[in-house]
């Protein structure tokens, strides 16, 4: 018995962006050291990342992808920042007059018609394109596939390779 998996909301490699989205509710931590300690405890990590957070640009999103590869978690999720109804980001979006989805399907993170918020430097389309490409980059990255093979075997690797052949329609 015991913990075998831990999901971490790593969000962004950019300290300023992380602190801004948490509005000071969380202290900044050395995520690299935390992930190392969790791995040493033989606990697998699901890393969650966000692209298109307020303040994000291509450079900061690339830093987040690079950090995710440095951490090399066994499971990887990436989302485009979405002002979900009821969230603080949604309240900010309403107050700022941002263009929001017209129906709930537009709030779905991976739907074809998802509509994340743009940043000052990036359009929603650019953020989605980056997120989709980052997903492919991570899941076809040989060190990740080697880690999956070590933990789950070649069948799991083959399934991932088949999955990454399917491109999302945009």
Where on the chain are the PLM-derived regions?
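A structural motif corresponding to the C-terminal lobe/cap of the Radical SAM core domain
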Residues: 1-155
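Short, amphipathic C-terminal "tail helix"
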Residues: 154-170
